[in-house]
Amino acid sequence: MLKPLGDRVVIEVLEAEEKTASGIVLPDSAKEKPQSGKIVAVGSGRVLDNGTKEPLEVAEGDTVIFAKYSGTEVTYEGTDYLILRESDILAITK
């Protein structure tokens, strides 16, 4: 499994809708880039200016909304993930 460093998290991206509310099937070129996903791994935390380590506010299993073009897309063992900094996460959905 991937283990992110520092203040980074690994997210399994939730796919965008295939159809509109009225039932129209969207081609790949018309789909919005997904902005939500489930956290599958978190780093050890961010290092503060005084040298202490602060744990992250998010945890494995949280579903989050993140900035549209943030992070780095990676494929690991056949699954696509997004690795991004905690500061790119906008909200946790419950």
UniProtKB/Swiss-Prot annotation:
Q: What does the entry give for GO biological process?
A: chaperone cofactor-dependent protein refolding
InterPro entries to which the protein is assigned, alphabetical:
Chaperonin_GroES, Chaperonin_GroES_sf, Chaprnonin_Cpn10_CS, GroES-like_sf
Sorted keywords for this record are: Chaperone, Cytoplasm
Question: Where does it localize?
Answer: Cytoplasm
Query: Cellular component per GO?
Result: cytoplasm
**Any one GO molecular-function label of the UniProt entry:** protein folding chaperone
PROSITE patterns in UniProt: CHAPERONINS_CPN10
Q: Which family does it belong to?
A: Belongs to the GroES chaperonin family.
Its assembly, as annotated, is: Heptamer of 7 subunits arranged in a ring. Interacts with the chaperonin GroEL.
Which HAMAP family does the annotation name? CH10
Per its database record, what is this protein's job?
Together with the chaperonin GroEL, plays an essential role in assisting protein folding. The GroEL-GroES system forms a nano-cage that allows encapsulation of the non-native substrate proteins and provides a physical environment optimized to promote and accelerate protein folding. GroES binds to the apical surface of the GroEL ring, thereby capping the opening of the GroEL channel.
What's the protein here called? Co-chaperonin GroES
Name the lineage: Bacteria, Bacillati, Bacillota, Bacilli, Bacillales
